[in-house]
């Protein structure tokens, strides 16, 4: 806000708003007057004589002014544009002023000055007109300074737009308050005017509602030229302006109260001046005084704000002076030195004894060396450090110790919360938004990488300085190689086919950038997903064929060497283009005997039965959910254990003749081998029970007579040829004997020899070191024998392991085996003699729980 004696152009905007606000106040007052005229017809009729007298006096005054001042008066056709009685030059000036203001509003240039300085002629006419009107009404000019000012028509000082009168008080539109006050103690004033009936000063509307302080005489003239008698009610409105807490709270109601009381006290003596009183009980002179009071108050308020701002600037300047700004060590480029952690001033004064003086000052040992980057604020204006070095001790979070040239970082011990968090995070997957790769996506990835590598080849070929013949020759080779790769994209199954791997040069080692380009062009996968997919599955150089016996043997050796870790190294040393993931899967599922359990315990059977009852939904069972309750068991193991052994609907014990007949009829209908379909016709029996019953008892091709010496000799020959333990192969060569018959006969013939004892030890050892439970995944069974596993253990631990007698294809020493014709095997009801048929119906077809080895 500018001062009172400031630039006139800078204070003109708010003054027009004052003029417009007064117009709004007068318009509202006239509206209320019209309403009050309708309600107070009796009072108006009583005062008609006074009004007529006043009209005559006013007309005489106007004629006197015209004759004495030589002023030509022109009544405007529309009073809303100019008040009646103003000289024509003044009216033209006001019209010009309003037109200029409207143009600024339309061009959105409100911030520019809008008032035009009046000419000397207009000022003189207005002064004469004002003096004549005041003399006619008996009013003395209170502010003579304004009449001497050539800008008397212009507004006074600026004021804050926020400090405005209450809207209800200015507008006077609260009819309820007006009616209530009319019924209470009210003061009736008769405003007698002479020139105009039911007209008021109208100025272009404005959004501002501040008090009026422009063209004081126009307002007085308007009041003097208002025709009719109106009865107004004086109400007390309290307006308190809230300002920031600087002990300058201002209550405008005190000013209003003061001026209103003065008007009431002087009402009887100044009855002739009632035409100056507005409908709200305040005349224009009092409003101007209130405006000046506001201006004085705002000036004080702004002065105090400026003082506070100046004080803040001084305090900020003092604070900046107290901090010595130094260029940090990493920004020092001159002087030919650079030392980490020490500023330039410190280096210049590092030899000082007391650590003070100069611009920078040296530091004592008790202070911390500055290690700031950029600007340093660690030293004061005297060059002394602001912070002292801490006493030596162990840091709270971590500390480093150098041992044998190696820096070791030590951290505090984990609390229970950090341990739980670490366990939880270790079990969380690295990537959550996973979805299965489709065949089309894999083909697009393969095609994209091939095209990118082909582009590289062609670019390198174009960069080589070759003759035309050499260029065409190499180009044909590249095209031929590309066509061959299109025909053999997925034919690499093992590492033995080295030539086929070399032909896959179009797919060798794509970078992350290449895969990112492929994803942008053809895939909806992220580059990381595509990279992992390529490295672990889609790369044609990956060996996806079945593991050979040599691979299993070498893999088992490397896994024991690295103690089940370092699978990347294991995959490289294996040398068969297997991925680390494929190596660990093969070891854990087929070679690690400690990974999966073999025999079911009674406790496991009880847990399995209870969990199935809890999680069975009709006939559907989620076996992967069941495995969470039984550690060390797979879903297939739980499924087979339940359906083959623990299901309460399974019958156990001797077979009845009716069951045998149903089994024979089903075998004749479906054929030998379709045991899944056959079991549906034998209620309560499993497929394994049906197979064992038919193959060992009911098969008409079986020979149930005693073993002859010729059969015994043939059994020994076949066993020596095939190997001990492969009883299924032995039974096939014997033709009319089952595997179980062959095993039991061989056991009976060698019960007194060491061969049987060695074989039993071998079977026991196999249970410990070999994986034998492959239910539902027979294709994962390894070809390694127990002898191979024992050989590997002896190579890795030759001293700790005792020498184990390796049993190979054991042969008997007796050429004439002892036969006991009096002792024959009665196998008519083998399954019936054992109440628990599960021993003969195991997952791995182990007909003898301890000794029988099934291939």
UniProtKB/Swiss-Prot annotation:
CDD domains: SANT. Residues 596-646 form the Myb-like domain. Keywords: Coiled coil, DNA-binding, Nucleus, Repeat, Transcription, Transcription regulation. One of its GO terms (cellular component) is snRNA-activating protein complex. The keyword Iron does not apply. Residues 291-324 form a coiled coil. Residues 26-72, 169-190, 221-240, 480-503, 800-828 are annotated as: Disordered. It holds the Pfam family Myb_DNA-bind_6. Transmembrane segments: none annotated. Residues 178-190, 483-499, 806-824 have a biased composition (Low complexity). The keyword Coiled coil applies. It is found in: Nucleus. InterPro entries: Homeodomain-like_sf, Myb-like_DNA-bd, Myb_dom, SANT/Myb. Residues 567-591, 675-698, 727-750 bind DNA. GO terms for biological process: snRNA transcription by RNA polymerase II; snRNA transcription by RNA polymerase III. It comes from the Eukaryota. PANTHER family: SNRNA-ACTIVATING PROTEIN COMPLEX SUBUNIT 4. This is Myb-like protein L. It comes from Dictyostelium discoideum. The lineage of its organism: Eukaryota, Amoebozoa, Evosea, Eumycetozoa, Dictyostelia. The gene is mybL.
């Amino acid at each position: 806000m500018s001062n009172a004696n400031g630039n006139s152009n800078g204070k003109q905007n708010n003054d027009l708003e004052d003029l417009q606000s007064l117009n709004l106040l007068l318009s509202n007052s006239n509206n209320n007057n019209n309403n009050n005229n309708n309600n107070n017809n009796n009072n108006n009729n009583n005062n008609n004589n006074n009004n007529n007298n006043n009209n005559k006096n006013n007309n005489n005054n106007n004629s006197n002014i015209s004759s004495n001042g030589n002023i030509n008066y022109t009544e405007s056709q529309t009073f809303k544009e100019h008040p009646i009685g103003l000289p024509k030059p003044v009216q033209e000036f006001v019209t010009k002023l309003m037109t200029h203001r409207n143009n600024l509003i339309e061009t959105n240039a409100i911030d520019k000055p809008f008032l035009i300085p009046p000419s000397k002629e207009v000022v003189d006419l207005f002064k004469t007109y004002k003096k004549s009107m005041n003399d006619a009404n008996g009013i003395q000019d209170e502010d003579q300074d304004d009449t001497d000012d050539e800008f008397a028509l212009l507004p006074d000082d600026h004021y804050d737009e926020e400090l405005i009168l209450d809207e209800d008080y200015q507008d006077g539109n609260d009819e309820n308050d007006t009616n209530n006050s009319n019924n209470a103690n009210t003061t009736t004033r008769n405003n007698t005017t002479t020139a105009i009936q039911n007209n008021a000063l109208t100025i272009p509307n404005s959004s501002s509602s501040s008090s009026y302080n422009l063209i004081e005489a126009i307002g007085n003239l308007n009041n003097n030229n208002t025709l009719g008698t109106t009865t107004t009610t004086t109400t007390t409105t309290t307006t308190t302006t809230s300002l920031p807490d600087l002990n300058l709270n201002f209550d405008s109601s005190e000013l209003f109260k003061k001026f209103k009381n003065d008007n009431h006290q002087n009402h009887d003596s100044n009855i002739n001046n009632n035409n100056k009183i507005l409908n709200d009980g305040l005349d224009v002179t009092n409003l101007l005084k209130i405006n000046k009071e506001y201006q004085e108050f705002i000036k004080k308020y702004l002065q105090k704000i400026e003082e506070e701002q100046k004080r803040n600037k001084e305090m900020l300047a003092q604070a900046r002076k107290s901090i010595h700004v130094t260029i940090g060590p990493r920004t020092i480029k001159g002087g030919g030195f650079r030392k980490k952690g020490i500023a330039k001033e410190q280096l210049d004064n590092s030899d000082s004894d007391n650590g003070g003086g100069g611009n920078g000052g040296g530091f004592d040992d008790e202070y911390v060396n500055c290690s700031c980057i950029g600007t340093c604020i660690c030293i004061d204006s005297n060059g002394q450090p602001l912070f002292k070095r801490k006493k030596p001790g162990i840091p709270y979070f971590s500390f480093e110790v150098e041992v044998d040239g190696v820096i070791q970082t030590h951290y505090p011990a984990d609390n229970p919360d950090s341990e739980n968090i670490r366990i939880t995070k270790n079990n969380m997957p690295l990537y959550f938004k996973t979805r299965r790769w489709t065949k089309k996506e894999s083909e697009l990835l393969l095609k994209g990488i091939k095209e990118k590598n082909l582009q590289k080849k062609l670019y390198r070929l174009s960069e080589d300085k070759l003759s035309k013949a050499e260029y065409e020759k190499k180009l044909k080779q590249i095209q031929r190689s590309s066509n061959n790769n299109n025909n053999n994209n997925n034919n690499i199954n093992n590492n033995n086919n080295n030539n086929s791997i070399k032909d896959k040069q179009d797919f060798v080692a794509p970078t992350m950038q290449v895969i990112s380009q492929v994803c942008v062009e053809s895939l909806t996968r992220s580059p990381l997903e595509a990279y992992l997919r390529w490295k672990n599955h889609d790369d044609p150089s990956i060996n996806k064929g079945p593991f050979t016996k040599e691979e299993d043997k070498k893999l088992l050796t490397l896994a024991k060497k690295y103690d089940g870790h370092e699978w990347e190294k294991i995959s490289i040393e294996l040398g068969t283009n297997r991925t680390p993931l494929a190596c660990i899967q093969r070891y854990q599922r087929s070679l690690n005997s400690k990974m999966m359990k073999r025999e079911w315990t009674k406790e496991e059977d009880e847990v399995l039965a209870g969990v199935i009852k809890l999680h069975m939904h009709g006939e559907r069972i989620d076996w992967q959910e069941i495995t969470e309750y039984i550690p060390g068991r797979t879903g297939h193991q739980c499924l087979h254990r339940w359906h083959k052994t623990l299901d309460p609907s399974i019958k156990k014990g001797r077979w009845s003749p009716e069951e045998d007949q149903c089994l024979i009829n089903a075998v004749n209908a479906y054929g030998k081998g379709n045991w899944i379909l056959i079991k549906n016709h034998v209620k309560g029996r499993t497929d394994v029970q049906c197979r064992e019953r038919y193959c060992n008892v009911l098969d008409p091709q079986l020979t149930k007579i005693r073993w002859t010496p010729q059969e015994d000799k043939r059994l020994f020959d076949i066993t020596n040829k095939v190997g001990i333990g492969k009883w299924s192969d032995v039974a096939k060569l014997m033709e009319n004997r089952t595997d179980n018959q062959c095993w039991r006969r061989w056991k009976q013939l060698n019960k007194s020899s060491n061969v049987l004892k060695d074989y039993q030890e071998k079977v026991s050892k196999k249970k410990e070191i070999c994986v034998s439970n492959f239910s539902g995944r027979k294709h994962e069974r390894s070809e390694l024998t127990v002898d191979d596993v024992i050989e590997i253990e002896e190579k890795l631990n030759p001293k700790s392991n005792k020498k184990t007698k390796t049993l190979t294809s054991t042969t008997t020493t007796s050429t004439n085996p002892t036969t006991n014709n009096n002792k024959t095997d009665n196998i008519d009801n083998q399954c019936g003699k054992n109440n628990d048929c599960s021993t003969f119906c195991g997952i791995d077809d182990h007909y003898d729980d301890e000794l029988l080895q099934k291939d």
